[in-house]
Amino acid sequence: MSIILQILVVALIVYSFVLIVAVPITLSTASGWSKSKSSIVTASIGWVGMVLLTGVLNSFVS
């Protein structure tokens, strides 16, 4: 179970870095928010889900 948590934490870190780079680039385009609103919201919801899943799994490991 510990290895699964470690893999999930690494995936969360990588996903966070991708969002840190991708969201500002997407929003800086001419039609940024209106064109990419659903993608940004979906990616953000996925990130929140990963954070919650990591927290739940951490409660079982610790």
Curated annotation (Swiss-Prot):
Subcellular location per the Swiss-Prot or TrEMBL entry: Plastid, Chloroplast thylakoid membrane
Membrane association type: Multi-pass membrane protein
Family matches, as Pfam families: Ycf9
Membrane spanning stretches: 8-28, 41-61
GO BP of this protein: photosynthesis; photosystem II stabilization
InterPro entries: PSII_PsbZ (IPR002644), PSII_PsbZ_sf (IPR036512)
Domain of life: Eukaryota
GO CC annotation terms, alphabetical: chloroplast thylakoid membrane; photosystem II reaction center
Function: May control the interaction of photosystem II (PSII) cores with the light-harvesting antenna, regulates electron flow through the 2 photosystem reaction centers. PSII is a light-driven water plastoquinone oxidoreductase, using light energy to abstract electrons from H(2)O, generating a proton gradient subsequently used for ATP formation.
Membership in a protein family: Belongs to the PsbZ family.
Subunit structure comment from the entry: PSII is composed of 1 copy each of membrane proteins PsbA, PsbB, PsbC, PsbD, PsbE, PsbF, PsbH, PsbI, PsbJ, PsbK, PsbL, PsbM, PsbT, PsbX, PsbY, PsbZ, Psb30/Ycf12, at least 3 peripheral proteins of the oxygen-evolving complex and a large number of cofactors. It forms dimeric complexes.
Protein name, UniProt field: Photosystem II reaction center protein Z
UniProt source species: Cyanidioschyzon merolae (strain NIES-3377 / 10D) (Unicellular red alga)
Gene behind this protein: psbZ
